[in-house]
């Protein structure tokens, strides 16, 4: 069963807020901007992560230095799963944040 529009927006909002909270609590020097449903994380080295919602197909998209990734929400797992690699969003963010900033952060709740 496909996510309802309201459920999709609630999930993306909660995910983006969790990402913001993790970066806020990390002490890492980042700029966070959340505007019109797009969350941008800018690292002090100029690289960035961009989280956007694709409402018509109910996906969360992540743009990073290493590429673009599309995530579907798995209700059974309660996680966002990459549609090309089956990697969980939290696992991918650990790897990408390390690659782009050199910092090891935990994204277990994602």
From Swiss-Prot:
Q: Name one GO molecular function term.
A: ferrous iron binding
Q: What do the Gene Ontology cellular component annotations say?
A: cytosol
SUPFAM superfamilies the record matches = Frataxin/Nqo15-like
InterPro entries recorded? CyaY, Frataxin/CyaY, Frataxin/CyaY_sf, Frataxin_CS
**What domain of life is recorded for the organism?**
Bacteria
Query: What keyword terms does UniProt attach to this protein?
Result: Iron, Metal-binding
Q: Which GO terms describe its biological process?
A: iron-sulfur cluster assembly
| Cross-referenced Pfam families | Frataxin_Cyay (PF01491)
The entry sums up its family as follows:
Belongs to the frataxin family.
* Function per UniProt: Involved in iron-sulfur (Fe-S) cluster assembly. May act as a regulator of Fe-S biogenesis.
This one is known as Iron-sulfur cluster assembly protein CyaY
